[in-house]
Structure formats: C-alpha cells, structure tokens
Amino acid sequence: MTDATTVHPLYDTYNRAALRFERGEGIWLITEDGERYIDFAAGIAVNSLGHSHPHLVETLKTQAEKLWHLSNVYEIPAQEKLGRRLVESTFADKVFFTNSGAEALECAIKTARRYQYVSGHPERFRIITFEGAFHGRTLATIAAGGQAKYLEGFGPKVEGFDQVPFGDEAALRAAITPETAGILLEPIQGEGGLRAFPEEFLRLVRQICDENGLLLLLDEVQTGVGRTGKLFAHEWAGIRPDIMAIAKGIGGGFPIGACLATAEAAKGMTAGMHGTTYGGNPLGMAVGNAVLDVVLADGFMENVQATALVMKQGLASLVDRYPNVVSEIRGRGLLMGLKCVVPNTSLIQALRDEHILSVGAGDNVVRLLPPLITTPEEAREALKHIETAVERLSIANPISKTV
C-alpha cells in the first residue's frame, strides 16, 4: 500500500486537462468556479443530446425507482422494446446489447466467425480491416485496429486480422483468402483522422463481400445515432451491412452498446454462445429508448443537417482565410475534423482558451463533435470563438510548416 496523500490513486492512462466540471446544461459544461464551456467534444461523441436533457433525466429518475439490474436469464421488456425499435429503423433483424463499443465490436467479430462456422466454413475466421482504424481497447479490437501504439507490450497480437491501406481496392481484393470471414470498417474513421470512405467505395466493399461469401461488418460506434445527419452513416451510401456495432450516442451519456445483425448473419449465435452481465440492464434500456424518442422525432435530423451546414460553411471560411493554421475540413454532419498545419494540440489548447472543448485525432486532426441538439444559432456563436482561436494561432505562426 502506498501513501494516499502523495500518490494519485488512479491509473496513469490518461493525460487529463486541468478542468473540473460540476454540471452541464445543453451544449454547455460548467466548472466548479462557474466558468462555462461549449462542449464540442461531447464525451467523444457520446453526449448526443447534450447535458441534462430533461427527457433523459426524467426517464432515468423514474426507472431508478423501479429496477436497476436484472440478469439476462429473465425477460426485460425495455430491452425488447429498444431492440424492436432498432430493428424497425435499420437493416437488422437481431440485436445484442452491451455496455460499450468495444464489447459491441467483440460481439460483431464473434458473430461473423460463428456464422462462417455454422455455415460449414470453420476455416473462415479472419477479418480484413483498414489501416488507421480504431475499434476498441480489448485484445481482439486492438488487433483489429492494428495500430502499433495500442498493441505494444500486450503480448502476441490476437490472430485473425489483416490490415490493408485505407481505401485501397487492389489491396483489399488481394487480402481475401479462403480463411477470410468478413470485412470490418468505420464509414468515417474517428481516431484515424476523420477520413471518410467515399460512398462508391462502400458500395464496392458491399459488392466484394457478396462476390466472395463474406460478411460486411460496420463499426458505427462514433458515426451512428444521427451523428452524420442520418440515423447511421452507411445510409448515405445506400448499403446494408450484415453486422453493425453501435454505442456512444445511443446512450446519450449512459453506457450502452449494441451489436445489430441480420437473421442470417446471427444464425450461429444460439443459446450459450455469448453473454453479458450488465448489457441490456433496465436503466440503460430506459435511457436508450428515451434517446430514440428524441432522435427519431420529426425534424430532429433536419436540425442536425442545418446545424452541420452552418458549421461547415464557417469552418470552410477559416480554411480559406487561415491556411497557415488549418488546411482541410473532414467528416460529415456533426462529426467534423479540422486538418491542422500547426500541431493539433496547439489548436485544441487555443480552443480551450476560448472555452470551446474539442478532441484530437490522428493525422494531425482536431475533432469537433457538437451535441446533436446544437442549434444553428449556437453553432454561429461557437464559430466566433473558434475563429478567435484560429486567428491567434495564425498571428503566432505566420510561416508554419505542415506537421
């Protein structure tokens, strides 16, 4: 035991900003000292309805007075309700609830492998992924992502994942072997730098899967639940996956994840093949249903798209006027990235100085992830602060070199 007065009790796995927030209201976070920040980090795309949304708060309070947790050996009506609503709104026939995106990806991977097994192809267990991907922090999902910085020191890489360069059709086709079970990708890579696969490439991947008897697995943990202006990002390309992992926005801040699949893809996931202690608990299911009450309401997606347009136009103006600071806008809807010329950490700090919270990403990108309830008027206010931050960096870095 160490001296609790001198040693911090938590793992040293986070480089935390010196900010402490006491409460939140809509798109705002308020510190212990009463300072207000516009939260365009949204818990890394989690707080889809902002902070203290009245419908979510009331739903959680009501459910907390009834049931918190039940084992999945019993029927949970709210779980069946949320599952049915997701099925009715998507390609899927079946849903498995988890507590996080990583767990949802684990379920997706197991579902794909199990499908091939019960289809008479036990040799098909490998999953093709794309360089720059991020699929979670479990041993299997860091192997799926393939990034060395997340694999270092954790022993042998879990077998069964093959990375190919981003958007490379030839490499993708060459990676397919008799052992391949499926292809896994994020429609827009989040941590990978807000790199969006072109719609035509997504359609091509769907075609390649069909031609080779493979399953298409989508990681919509960050892109899903309205973040891009449609319920799920793959809808823009008009494709239907076989399996999809979701989390983040579906809970609005409460830890919920889910793996969605067609009946065919899920046919191997029979009793005893997978399980979870907390996944699908009554508290989480109540909140998930409350989130869908709002997200599926008439006019909600239109507001997301209208706010996204305001943000895109404002950020485009900054790229035009401050090319020594930012060079490109990436992403879609309210999943936005600014490709930086200065170090992205400099822009993150400059934004924080202007009381705008943002998130870093790979490829020297800064993510802006406004809550989906952000109005065009609030977006315009935020853009004023963003411009001030960018202008200050421009003055300080008149001849910045590309990082």
From Swiss-Prot:
Query: Any idea which UniProt keywords this protein has?
Result: Amino-acid biosynthesis, Aminotransferase, Arginine biosynthesis, Cytoplasm, Pyridoxal phosphate, Transferase
List residues binding pyridoxal 5'-phosphate. 101-102, 134, 219-222, 277
| Cofactors that this protein relies on | pyridoxal 5'-phosphate
Annotated residues that bind N(2)-acetyl-L-ornithine are located at: 137, 276
Q: List the PROSITE patterns.
A: AA_TRANSFER_CLASS_3
- What InterPro entries does its record include? AcOrn/SuccOrn_fam, Aminotrans_3, Aminotrans_3_PPA_site, Class-III_PLP-dep_AT, PyrdxlP-dep_Trfase, PyrdxlP-dep_Trfase_major, PyrdxlP-dep_Trfase_small
- A GO cellular component entry from the record: cytoplasm
Name positions with the PTM N6-(pyridoxal phosphate)lysine. Answer: 248
The answer to whether the entry has keyword rRNA-binding is no
Q: Which GO terms describe its molecular function?
A: identical protein binding; N2-acetyl-L-ornithine:2-oxoglutarate 5-aminotransferase activity; pyridoxal phosphate binding
* Pathway named in the protein's UniProt entry: Amino-acid biosynthesis; L-arginine biosynthesis; N(2)-acetyl-L-ornithine from L-glutamate: step 4/4
Pfam families in the record = Aminotran_3
As its record notes, the protein acts as a catalyst of:
N(2)-acetyl-L-ornithine + 2-oxoglutarate = N-acetyl-L-glutamate 5-semialdehyde + L-glutamate
- GO biological process terms, semicolon-separated: L-arginine biosynthetic process
Q: What's its top-level EC category?
A: transferase
- How many cofactors are bound and how? Binds 1 pyridoxal phosphate per subunit.
- List localization entries: Cytoplasm
Question: Would you identify the family this protein belongs to, as annotated?
Answer: Belongs to the class-III pyridoxal-phosphate-dependent aminotransferase family. ArgD subfamily.
Q: How does it assemble?
A: Homodimer.
Q: Which HAMAP family match?
A: ArgD_aminotrans_3 (MF_01107)
Q: Tell me what else is known.
A: May also have succinyldiaminopimelate aminotransferase activity, thus carrying out the corresponding step in lysine biosynthesis.
For this entry, the protein name equals Acetylornithine aminotransferase
- Which organism does this record belong to? Brucella melitensis biotype 1 (strain ATCC 23456 / CCUG 17765 / NCTC 10094 / 16M)
Q: Which gene encodes it?
A: argD
